[in-house]
Amino acid sequence: MYEVKLDAFNGPLDLLLHLIHKYEIDIYDIPMKALTEQYMNYIHAMKKLEINIASEYLVVASELLMIKSKMLLPQHDTEMDDEIEDPREDLVGRLIEYQNYKEYTEFLNELKEQREQFYSKHPTDLSHLESIETWDDSQTIDLTELIMAYQRIKTRTSFNTPKSVTIQKETFTIEQASKQVTEKLAVSNSINFFSLFTFKENTEEIVTHFLAILEMSKTGIIQINQVKDFADINITRGVNYGIGA
């Protein structure tokens, strides 16, 4: 007596692979009697429950019975025995091909799920800024100093943030960071670079602030200066500060 559990399968080959894995059958040496019996049990169970059976399942059932019958025929000892075609060969080839296809599909689905954990931002159109007058940067600090300051902020922030971070769809934009800098400069003509941070920001917010400062500096909205190496970095209003506000 057999216990049959009806699962959802994507066609007869999917059902055969399920049975092969369930009963730990060697796909290269399939015992046709056992596999055919299990397959037919599934077909009979569907009929008993009055479930419509797709014609492709019945076609494969006929094929299994034919292969089983051929394997039961007596084998005559001849010099050509080694060249006799195994009646299972075509079925095995199709099963292996389907198995490879299924594994590759699962792999692609995993990649898709991983990609869905990331959120992309489309490039910002800055073409309207091309005509804005740029300012003389002869007294600006070296970009290396600004990058070093960014690294110090990131290092200090890492001690105040949890190791596990929940991904949220709400992102901190360059426009928001630029607005914060502009609002601080509206109150004071000069602000300290490090005053922009609470050191509780996540990496995304730090990077966004950094990119906003670079963009504002490039377009002359702010000016960045440093009295000497490793000293505080000061941000002041640039020649284009307030234009278009």
Curated annotation (Swiss-Prot):
GO BP annotations, alphabetical order: cell division; chromosome segregation; DNA replication
Species: Staphylococcus carnosus (strain TM300)
Annotated gene: scpA
Protein name: Segregation and condensation protein A
Family statement drawn from the similarity comment of this UniProt entry: Belongs to the ScpA family.
UniProt xrefs under InterPro entries: ScpA, ScpA-like_C
Subunit structure, as described in the record: Component of a cohesin-like complex composed of ScpA, ScpB and the Smc homodimer, in which ScpA and ScpB bind to the head domain of Smc. The presence of the three proteins is required for the association of the complex with DNA.
Keywords: Cell cycle, Cell division, Chromosome partition, Cytoplasm
One Pfam family matching this protein: SMC_ScpA
A GO cellular component entry from the record: cytoplasm
Subcellular location(s) of the protein: Cytoplasm
Record function comment: Participates in chromosomal partition during cell division. May act via the formation of a condensin-like complex containing Smc and ScpB that pull DNA away from mid-cell into both cell halves.
Major localisation: cytoplasm
